[in-house]
Amino acid sequence: MAKAPKTAYVCNDCGAEFSRWQGQCSACKAWNTITEVRLISTAKSKNDRFSGYAGETQAKIQTLSEISLQETPRFSSGFSELDRVLGGGIVPGSAILIGGHPGAGKSTLLLQVMCGLAKNMTALYVTGEESLQQVAMRASRLGLPSDQLKMLSETSVEQICNLADQLKPQIIVVDSIQVMHLADIQSSPGSVAQVRECASFLTRYAKTRQVAIIMVGHVTKDGTLAGPKVLEHAIDCSLLLEGEADSRYRTLRSHKNRFGAVNELGVFGMTEQGLREVKNPSAIFLSRGDEITSGSSVMVLWEGTRPLLVEIQALVDHSMLANPRRVAVGLEQNRLALLLAVLHRHGGLQMADQDVFVNVVGGVKVSETSADLALLLALISSFRNRPLPQDLVIFGEVGLAGEIRPVPSGQERISEAAKHGFKRAIVPFGNKPKSAVENMQVFTVKKLTDALAVLDNL
């Protein structure tokens, strides 16, 4: 009599396994995300080519000094913004995951990249969601050279790797990982087990063949990559392509990168010919015209290895509600509440009866604390209905005691602002330039009261 297959219960969000079903995942605290999956015994690989890892067919112990320090040469994707996010180009043997909402432009960007790379190397584009005719129509509409790019419509990972062994490409795109499946996994495509095992299989194939594999992934409603968390641990680089549906600009950000900086940012513009690089991102995020308005300030972000000028807009208005509204777009809601408390305690401005709305222009998401001072001065400008000078740039972290703390790369931020024509800057005292910046008047402040005093004299 055949034994009944073993089962386990796996969380669809984080991949945690349990011996029985429960309503809430004790690992990630999500509700109703645990599903039953069948377990199969992992047999020894019948193909020795798939048994090695990182290019080695058999594992062996080495001393650290015996390992070659020669860096694997990268190759360019054809897009300098994408190369920047990847850390300087595509590394052979790397496994890259790129996610984004439907319509963000993931497939369009990768099709443009692959058509360009196919001129000088063997490139394979595997589509599992679209037919070959649909991909060909998109390439024709975008005016892309399509005579060299190899195409394959397949969802079986084993078959994809077998065909790739015959073609021997230098780069493979798999669109998308959620529709791929392995025959040995007893679950439907898109399940936790299938996504995890397919990604691991493709990653192992990339390492053993020294072929770069780019996998397309779906995202959840909150903007995180769908599938188990172990998916992000298995790959080398995780990218997220973001952009509002009604916006012509897209931002590509690295959330994990073993070959470069994390949180590196690349900016693209969506056109009729596909995605185009934006060489000067600061220009598109500064939307101010000739008319000076209150509640607007400019700060310098540090995204990965590049400085970026961003405009912050604030609107403070008397509230008709018992509980005034606090809305932050592009900024953390809790950070806004914290700064309002600091402004009341150490700045003497009471906004408890005011509605407060804050927005970062261009859809940029700001997570670093260097935006604190710029946000506070924008709030004060709106509250007093007094515009800030157009040639003023601001950055600095604000502490709970009202102190202004320095931020990393202060000199580079000031220099970037000067390049864009800004004449004045309010910065923390700890970021005081070691030498004078040409055509830039720098005001250094230690406390919030110092910043308010500078603001009154501008």
Curated annotation (Swiss-Prot):
Q: What class of enzyme is it?
A: hydrolase
Give an example GO biological process. Answer: recombinational repair
The record's SMART domains line, in alphabetical order, gives:
AAA
Transmembrane portions of the chain: none
Q: Which Gene3D superfamilies match?
A: 3.30.230.10, P-loop containing nucleotide triphosphate hydrolases
EC number(s) on file: 3.6.4.-
Keywords, A to Z, come to:
ATP-binding, DNA damage, DNA repair, DNA-binding, Hydrolase, Metal-binding, Nucleotide-binding, Stress response, Zinc, Zinc-finger
Zinc finger residue extent: C4-type: 11-28
| Lon-protease-like: annotated span | 355-458
- Annotated domain remarks: Has a putative N-terminal zinc-finger, a middle region with homology to RecA with ATPase motifs including the RadA KNRFG motif, while the C-terminus is homologous to Lon protease.
- Describe the function of this protein: DNA-dependent ATPase involved in processing of recombination intermediates, plays a role in repairing DNA breaks. Stimulates the branch migration of RecA-mediated strand transfer reactions, allowing the 3' invading strand to extend heteroduplex DNA faster. Binds ssDNA in the presence of ADP but not other nucleotides, has ATPase activity that is stimulated by ssDNA and various branched DNA structures, but inhibited by SSB. Does not have RecA's homology-searching function.
Could you identify this protein by its name?
Answer: DNA repair protein RadA
Q: What is the lineage of its organism?
A: Bacteria, Pseudomonadati, Pseudomonadota, Gammaproteobacteria, Pasteurellales
